[in-house]
Amino acid sequence: MNLKNKKILITGATGGIGNSLVKKFSDLGAKIIASGTNEQKLENIKKIYQNVQIEKFKLEEHQNIEKFIEKVFNDLGGLDILINNAGITLDNISIRLTEENWKKVLDINLTSSFLMCKFAIKKMLKQKFV
């Protein structure tokens, strides 16, 4: 698979899977924006990978997702691939999970992914990449 110079946004880039995705796509020559909420881990990514830009972004801020996608699109000069890798768990045992925490998990893990796709696809369609 040739991903050289493909423009990729990876959310949840500071976690284990996200970091592995950044490494793999970086090794394949992609242009990447790595997104997460942990500034120190984002800075570490920036130090390790020369072709990776970093952006701190909180996915629960739904009102800012469209602007975030616009910024990513402008910074990369387009967007070819969106990887919705970010997610949270608050308690692995459902009988202890409060309804409030359940809603927070759904909000970040599902609603944010939906909105990221919605706004990214709009940009991609204009590029004719979808």
Describe each PLM feature range.
Residues 86-90:
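Conserved NAD(P)H cofactor-binding loop of Rossmann-fold oxidoreductase domains
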Residues 6, 78-79, 124-130:
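Active-site loop of short-chain dehydrogenase/reductase
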